[in-house]
């Protein structure tokens, strides 16, 4: 083993945070320093030349001063016996650089040097206390000496399976195994298994039992939703699932697939779908329907235990569900949601956040909201899927019950991951597998993670042993999932020649659930080989190999004659796959093990999928009554508390961490207006890169209401989703389809009956009355946390919780409505549309919660016809252009609605509550359904007329108008009730986000952003163009018919090729998909291309620094280096590197003529991924891309984590800044070069955002012009822009340069 020192692993502010955590455990710690250590496993000693090459390969990250290596050493390593995702990618890079025969494997550890007083070493007991804050025990281990790291490369002996002696020990033996293995088997299931194995005259193996437990867990089989019911002694006619399916029975139109696949499919529009030709690789359009898959998952249990990987794998699993729909599909855009208990932010604890405690086995609500959103966002970012909408609720309350005071809340959180994608019409239905078809696993290796996750998530939190809880959390590798998705995309692009007959994602239960499901769906069995499963941990037992939930895997069936084609696609994408065996006509599952010459599984399929007795729920309802609300304090104090409640407050800290523009198909994200305020009601995507049609999605949830009335809570969730999605231009209400995610603490007093009432209200009554279908959903029935503390038994039980996600095809993305108040200086009016017919019930509201109360009466949807008429009226008014702004009423009531509209429009309000009655508190803070619209004064009569035509004549109230003065004034007739400064209210509303950013990110950046929000003179994003974007300067050249070829270059993990190809295709080029494997293998030569376009993404998952692995696989591979050097030297060639491509090209400066001044790009100053709509100014340079654009200030997309330009010295940065080769600079909204955050999103000196070579042929840029080459791709833009975005000029300039 060789070791090479790496760079410091943590920045100063991260070290300071870690030091504080360490001192909480060991007060005598005086200092801590961390640096990376690289560990190289080589078959023979490496030469000096090899070590020098490795040294250059491993030179990555910011160049900062190293700290003192004093005190005690704790070396954190990947867990011995495992191969980390870092290792597999770094080893790939090393092998691609020509060291494959000399380096077997590389791993990376982190060396922590921790000192006591005077730099002394710590005691062993003290070091033990520090280990939990330094490592993740699921995936890492800690050693005390560098030489102990050799254990990483030691061989591990595989272990055999075990059996459970059912024949000798009977049921008692199975009861013991159930407890020890965490199988979560019910009594009737154990009886069933004893009977079946007695019939078979043999004992079950641990593999067979775990497989049965996973396949038949509540998580996988939804036993409660399929159960029969008796409530209060009265048998019920339907199961819960039958009530949901009733919506489909009543309204099938527009639904192409429901209930039987990984996602539902609904009808989309016929459009020009854009993807590379399977034959030529050239990107082009195919006219066909782009049907829409929709799916929403939960990942609650893992997120409670370990939030970052829990949320990350939640997002990853849902993405795989979409990709594995039908015969393969493409995910497009995501949504996310979190419900947690009190945040209790240190230094910002709120009066209503009374402490109650939590069990040690789960993390706090605060930790969930610090780490969980980062995990979900990071997975989406790296995979390459924009996350465009979501919700966040913080709720915990003590309530009186007949049995005493109970705590209701979300110690077991809700973590929602959902989204939509597109699928070809011919691939909506899965094909039938035939005997002899190959059963294949595609994706990463088996790892000992997530064992028993399906069973574990089916138990109440705390009902299983802590080690089993922790073992059931999976770990993520988004870059691997991206490679698999590229294979799936290549397969569906083949149309009728798609080699995939059927595909499932590998989720709960791992292969033990996915493989039998694939065979069983086709009435087949399978003969399989255990050792064919790719395995990163050779020491695992058969049960661990077969049942682990290692992520980023799919199982699929391929005909033998299509195997070679499928293998070639996998090889090109470097996506691992393995043939596990064959499908068989005999319906038996036989899993052989060549290692031990036995069969861990040999089971008739009907044992696994037989029908254990159907569950019956015999439950009683529990009547509740809550005292009338007593709301203390002035109206101004109530208003402040409501705005600062996390459920109402600014969600920026959850949004700017997530890429919202990757793929170039986002049209409406969360951020609204020139001040980019996160208040959008819904998300809107484009059907394809050239369309104005699209898809919308929105969410609705009103879970606190369920404490009062579960049925009303469910109806309100549907209602909120509809008032949100109404902001998109949708044909008719029945075009909207819903996903329903149901959470309940089944078995807790009264909760089962409440769940039944909620499902019945939506499935049997409201949705049929509205013409709505629920073709997809999920249930999680163990929403209770139990523990002991100080000898007392404690519990936190969630309310019955319905999260609705609404999806619909969109007729015209340009007509999406937002809450931004516009034309404030003109005569406009605010109309309030009240869908509660004057009722102002405050039960379950935020204003009740800030008083620690619930309230006796819940808002409700009492007249579905009113909601139907409202939706139709809003669509008619949207089509006619009569609505200037729109925002629904929800959490925080009318007060939050009005404030958010004022924040988005950066204006004041003059509001009169007199039309709403005399109870101003109820009028302002009730959360009944409704919406506020802004209309021109001259249009008020016509708008009222349209609303009246739809049955809303008595539900419209004129409340006042927006004003230019930055003051929100609330009156009741002539009495002023409140007059608050808009910016002061905005600071109150944004305080939670500021405090969370300060805790999580670089606090200096959080302070700078907070200060920027308070700038009263901020004009908002202010683009200024020196050219006409409507002028097509390339038209004369395109008219000649020549389409120069450009290579749209990608490496494994790159995800932004579609938008790059779209921009250059629109500019008259022939854009060709080129993978680095094509070049390294010699399949493709760069000689036939005029341009090389290096795309954005996460090549090699940013291992060895962003773009570093990609660059080094060129520099250190002779064939690739020669090819690129020759291309760069040609005078007729040009190149563009964007984001990851920019990071990569900057490291090729030694072989790019005139690029010696290129910097390297390192971690953003915020130490966070930054996704924003920014401003840059174009400078005068030789760059061929920017000719005629000089002096323009332009809107551009920022999406990167490592975009800070780093030069060898301050002097070097100043020198490069003066060379006339900086193409673009970040500027603030006043047009000044931006040095502070967030106008300068990464901290680059002199605002440097892009550079070019001395002759202008090669340009690099961190922000993404290709993602906003059309105006509809901007989250905000001036209304006068046409279809071409200003950045389209840049791509046309390249066509002009070629002539």
UniProtKB/Swiss-Prot annotation:
Compartment(s) where it occurs, according to its Swiss-Prot or TrEMBL record: Cytoplasm
Any GO molecular function: ATP binding
Catalytic reaction list: N(2)-formyl-N(1)-(5-phospho-beta-D-ribosyl)glycinamide + L-glutamine + ATP + H2O = 2-formamido-N(1)-(5-O-phospho-beta-D-ribosyl)acetamidine + L-glutamate + ADP + phosphate + H(+)
Keywords: ATP-binding, Cytoplasm, Glutamine amidotransferase, Ligase, Magnesium, Metal-binding, Nucleotide-binding, Purine biosynthesis
Biological or metabolic pathway of the protein: Purine metabolism; IMP biosynthesis via de novo pathway; 5-amino-1-(5-phospho-D-ribosyl)imidazole from N(2)-formyl-N(1)-(5-phospho-D-ribosyl)glycinamide: step 1/2
Pfam short name (any one): FGAR-AT_PurM_N-like
GO cellular component, as recorded: cytoplasm
Active site: 1139 (nucleophile), 1264, 1266
Residues annotated as binding ATP: 310-321, 389-391, 680, 890
GO biological process, one term: 'de novo' IMP biosynthetic process
EC number: 6.3.5.3
Start and end residues of each Glutamine amidotransferase type-1 domain: 1046-1299
Binding residue positions for Mg(2+): 681, 720, 724, 888
SMART domains: GATase_5 (SM01211)
Protein family according to the UniProt entry: In the N-terminal section; belongs to the FGAMS family.
Oligomer status and interactors: Monomer.
Purpose: Phosphoribosylformylglycinamidine synthase involved in the purines biosynthetic pathway. Catalyzes the ATP-dependent conversion of formylglycinamide ribonucleotide (FGAR) and glutamine to yield formylglycinamidine ribonucleotide (FGAM) and glutamate.
Protein name: Phosphoribosylformylglycinamidine synthase
Organism annotation: Myxococcus xanthus (strain DK1622)
Lineage: Bacteria, Pseudomonadati, Myxococcota, Myxococcia, Myxococcales
């Amino acid at each position: 083993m060789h070791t090479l020192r790496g760079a410091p692993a943590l920045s100063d502010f991260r070290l300071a945070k870690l030091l504080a955590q360490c001192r909480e455990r060991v007060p005598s710690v005086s200092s801590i320093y961390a640096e990376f250590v690289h560990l190289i496993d080589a078959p023979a000693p490496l030469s000096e030349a090899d070590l020098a090459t490795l040294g250059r390969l491993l030179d990555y990250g910011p160049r900062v001063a190293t700290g003192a290596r004093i005190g005690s050493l704790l070396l954190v390593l990947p867990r011995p016996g495992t191969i980390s995702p870092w290792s597999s990618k770094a080893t790939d890079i090393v092998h691609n650089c020509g060291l494959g025969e000399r380096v077997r494997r590389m791993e990376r550890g982190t060396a922590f040097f921790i000192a006591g007083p005077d730099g002394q070493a710590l005691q062993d007991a003290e070091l033990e206390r520090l280990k939990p804050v330094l490592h993740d025990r699921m995936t890492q281990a800690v050693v005390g000496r560098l030489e102990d790291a050799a254990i990483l490369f030691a061989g591990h002996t595989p272990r055999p399976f075990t059996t459970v002696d059912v024949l000798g020990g009977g049921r008692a033996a199975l009861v013991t195994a159930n407890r020890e293995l965490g199988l979560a088997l019910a009594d009737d299931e154990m009886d069933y298994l004893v009977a079946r194995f007695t019939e078979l005259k043999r004992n079950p193996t641990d593999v067979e039992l775990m497989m049965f437990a996973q396949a038949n867990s509540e998580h996988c089989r939804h036993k409660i939703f399929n159960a029969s019911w008796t409530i209060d002694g009265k048998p019920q006619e339907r199961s819960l699932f039958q009530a949901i399916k009733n919506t489909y029975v009543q309204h099938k139109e527009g639904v192409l697939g429901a209930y039987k696949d990984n996602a539902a499919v609904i009808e989309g529009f016929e459009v020009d779908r854009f993807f590379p030709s399977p034959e030529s690789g050239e990107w082009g359009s195919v006219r066909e329907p782009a049907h829409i898959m929709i799916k929403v998952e939960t990942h609650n249990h893992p997120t409670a235990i370990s939030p970052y990987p829990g949320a990350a794998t939640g997002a990853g699993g849902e993405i795989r569900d979409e990709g594995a729909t039908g015969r393969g599909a493409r995910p497009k855009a995501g949504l996310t949601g979190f419900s947690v208990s009190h945040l209790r932010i240190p230094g910002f604890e709120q009066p209503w956040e009374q402490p109650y405690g939590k069990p040690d086995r789960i993390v706090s609500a605060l930790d969930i909201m610090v780490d969980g959103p980062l995990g979900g966002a990071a997975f989406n970012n790296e995979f390459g899927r924009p996350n465009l909408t979501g919700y966040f609720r913080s709720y915990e309350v003590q309530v009186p019950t007949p049995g005493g005071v109970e705590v209701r809340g979300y110690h077991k959180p809700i973590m929602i991951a959902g989204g939509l994608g597109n699928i070809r019409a011919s691939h909506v239905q899965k094909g039938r597998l035939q005997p002899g078809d190959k059963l294949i696993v595609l994706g990463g290796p088996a790892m000992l993670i997530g064992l028993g996750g399906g069973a574990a998530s089916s138990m109440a939190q705390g009902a299983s042993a802590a080690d089993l809880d922790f073992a059931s959390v999976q770990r993520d590798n988004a870059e691997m999932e991206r490679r698999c998705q590229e294979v799936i995309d290549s397969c569906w692009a083949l149309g009728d020649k798609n080699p995939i007959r059927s595909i499932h994602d590998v989720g709960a239960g791992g292969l033990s659930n996915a493989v039998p499901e694939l065979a069983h769906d086709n009435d087949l069995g399978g003969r399989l080989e255990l050792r064919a499963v790719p395995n990163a941990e050779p020491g695992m037992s058969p049960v661990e190999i077969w049942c682990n939930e290692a992520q980023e895997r799919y199982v699929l069936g391929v005909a033998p004659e299509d195997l070679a084609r499928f293998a070639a696609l996998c090889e090109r994408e470097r996506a691992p796959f393995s043939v596990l065996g064959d499908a068989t006509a005999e319906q038996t599952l036989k899993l052989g093990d060549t290692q031990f010459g036995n069969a861990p599984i040999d089971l008739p399929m009907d044992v696994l999928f037989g029908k254990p007795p159907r569950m019956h729920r015999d439950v009683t309802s529990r009547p509740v009554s809550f005292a009338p609300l007593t709301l203390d304090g002035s109206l101004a104090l109530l208003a402040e508390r409501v705005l600062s409640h996390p459920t109402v407050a600014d969600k920026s800290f959850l949004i700017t961490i997530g890429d919202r523009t990757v793929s170039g198909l986002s049209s409406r994200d969360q951020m609204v207006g020139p001040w980019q305020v996160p208040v959008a009601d819904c998300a809107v995507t484009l059907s394809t890169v050239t369309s104005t049609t699209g898809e919308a999605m929105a969410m609705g949830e009103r879970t606190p209401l369920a404490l009062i009335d579960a049925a009303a809570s469910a109806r309100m969730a549907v209602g909120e989703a509809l008032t949100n999605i109404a902001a998109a231009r949708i044909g008719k209400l029945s075009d909207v389809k819903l996903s329903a995610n149901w959470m309940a603490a089944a078995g807790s007093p009264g909760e089962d009956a409440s769940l039944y009432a909620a499902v019945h209200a939506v499935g049997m009554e409201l949705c049929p009355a509205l013409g709505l279908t629920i073709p997809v959903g999920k249930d999680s029935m163990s929403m209770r946390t139990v523990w002991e503390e100080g000898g007392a038994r404690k519990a936190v039980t969630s309310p019955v919780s319905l999260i609705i996600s609404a999806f619909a095809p969109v007729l015209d993305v340009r007509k999406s409505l937002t809450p931004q108040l516009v034309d404030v200086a003109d005569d406009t009016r605010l109309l309030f549309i009240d869908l509660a017919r004057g009722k102002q019930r405050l039960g379950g509201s935020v204003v009740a919660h800030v008083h620690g109360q619930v309230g006796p009466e819940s808002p409700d949807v009492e007249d579905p016809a009113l909601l139907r008429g409202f939706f139709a009226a809003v669509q008619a008014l949207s089509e006619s252009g009569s609505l200037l702004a729109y925002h629904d009423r929800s959490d925080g009531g009318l007060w939050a609605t009005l404030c958010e509209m004022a924040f988005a429009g950066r204006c004041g309000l003059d509001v009169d509550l007199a039309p709403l009655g005399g109870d101003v508190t109820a009028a302002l803070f009730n959360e009944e359904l409704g919406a506020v619209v802004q209309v021109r004064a001259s249009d008020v009569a016509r708008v009222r007329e349209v609303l009246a035509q739809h049955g809303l004549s008595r539900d419209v109230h004129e409340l006042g108008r927006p004003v230019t003065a930055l003051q929100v004034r609330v009156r009741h007739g002539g009495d002023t009730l409140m007059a608050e400064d808009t910016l002061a209210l905005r600071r109150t509303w944004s305080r939670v986000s500021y405090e969370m950013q300060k805790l999580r990110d670089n606090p200096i950046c959080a302070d700078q952003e907070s200060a920027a929000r308070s700038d009263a003179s901020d004009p908002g994003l202010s683009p200024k163009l020196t050219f006409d974007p409507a002028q097509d300067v390339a038209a004369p050249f395109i008219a000649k018919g020549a389409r120069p070829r450009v290579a749209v270059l990608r490496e494994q993990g790159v995800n932004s090729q579609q938008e790059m190809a779209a921009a250059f295709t629109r500019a008259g080029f022939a854009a060709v998909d080129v993978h680095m494997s094509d070049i390294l293998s010699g399949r493709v030569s760069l000689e036939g291309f005029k341009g090389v376009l290096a795309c954005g993404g996460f090549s090699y998952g940013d291992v060895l620094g962003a773009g570093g692995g990609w660059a080094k696989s060129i520099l250190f591979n002779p064939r690739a280096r020669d090819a690129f050097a020759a291309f760069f030297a040609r005078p007729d060639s040009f190149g563009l590197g964007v984001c990851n491509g920019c990071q990569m090209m900057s490291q090729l400066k030694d072989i790019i003529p005139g690029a010696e001044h290129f910097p390297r790009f390192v971690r953003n100053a915020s130490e966070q991924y930054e996704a924003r709509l920014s401003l840059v100014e174009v400078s005068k340079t030789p760059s061929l891309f920017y000719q005629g654009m000089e002096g323009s200030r332009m809107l551009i997309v920022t999406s990167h984590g490592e975009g800070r330009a780093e030069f060898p010295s301050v002097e070097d940065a100043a020198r490069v800044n003066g060379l006339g080769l900086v193409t673009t600079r970040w500027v603030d909204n006043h047009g000044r070069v931006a040095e502070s955050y967030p106008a300068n999103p990464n901290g680059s000196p002199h605002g440097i955002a892009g550079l070019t070579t001395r002759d202008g042929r090669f340009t690099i840029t961190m922000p993404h012009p290709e993602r906003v080459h059309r105006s509809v791709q901007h989250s905000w833009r001036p209304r006068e822009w046409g279809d071409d975005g200003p950045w389209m000029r840049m791509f046309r300039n390249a066509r002009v340069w070629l002539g």
